[in-house]
Amino acid sequence: MFLLCVAGLPLSTIHAQKKEIIDDEAPNGIVIVTIDKAGDEIIRIMNESQLPYIHDPKAPRFLLMDKQGKFALGIGGYVRATGEYDFGGIVDDIDFVPANIPSSSKIKNQFQMDASTATIFLKLVGHTRLLGDFTVYTAGNFRGGDKTFQLRNAYMSFRNITVGYTYGGFMDLGALPSTIDFQGPNGATFYRATQLSYTYKGLKDFRFQASIEAPAVDGTTSSQFEIAQQRMPDFTASAQYSWNSSSHLRVGGIIRSMTYTSTERDKASSVTGYGVQASTTFNLGKKWQAFGQVNYGKGIGQYLNDISNLNVDIVPNPEKEGKMQALPMLGWYAGLQYNISPKVFLLSLIHISEPTRHLRI
């Protein structure tokens, strides 16, 4: 499969200039400024709140600001078009999802183009005595049904607390390689959840995070079972050590309770799932960047590329009548990126994700 990506409106990291306050007769009004004239504090918050994910838009070029320079609202996004040619009839989908590869296919060649990952966003940043540095962020693309708008992020962050809908705690955005394919690497954890999370940054070079998240459970059921309303949130925790701005090592975990109902007994039961993760990215000189991640657990298929669409969090237990079980899962990837120039790079990946081989349903 051959992939080609073209992106519009590329935005680089912004740099601070001397703070400028616009002085006129209406001190409480709103003005439009370019990002480089937003002032040191606004630029710092914009940069520090930028998530390390290649498909997230960077800071906007223009801002709406109050004339005291305390608050700024950015509106921005990008247009991204992807073209691909499939020489072997691999997957009838614009995304490369190995779990969907058929055992045989009549389609041998296929050309596709897609622009549904074009993204728009609103980002409000500022500083108050009560909230400290804060960010309110919403973003979406057009990956809903029939290319309709789909919400990707909607959250508020203040004093290291995040509330809302965004990337889950059982994943490492910084260790994801820069793939053209929007689906991302097979074997990585990737999901979004409504959550309450806290990040501790008080120890130099270390970062600790914990979150409570709304659960999402998919399972393979039969006439005997139904996936019930979930009674417990997911709990995640992680610790990360960084030795420079582009190198870190992270370990994390998740524990979850998955509720199901037996139609024969009319009774709700639950299965405990868990996951552990180790991930890293580090530079090898000025040109090379390495990426890697290993995930193992039970009942984490919902969060693991690319088996999240196979409904294998929980399945009927063939050894216990009337019971369901959480399947063991393993996923990993390793990548190496060569930066030809600041704007051009080459990437090679090896990855795998799978439920256990004893899947018996």
PLM features: residue spans?
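Bacterial Sec-dependent N-terminal signal peptides
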Residues: 1-19
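N-terminal periplasmic/intermembrane-space "pro-region" immediately following the signal or transit peptide
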Residues: 14-85
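Extracytoplasmic loops and strand-loop junctions of Gram-negative outer membrane beta-barrel proteins
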Residues: 57-61, 101-107, 178-181, 220-222, ...
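Outer membrane beta-barrel
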Residues: 66-93, 103-217, 236, 240-243, ...
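Outer-membrane beta-barrel and related beta-rich outer-membrane complex signature
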Residues: 87-91, 151, 222, 263, ...
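Extracellular/periplasmic loop regions
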Residues: 289-329, 333-335
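Single conserved hydrophobic/aromatic residue that forms the stacking wall/gate
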Residues: 350-361
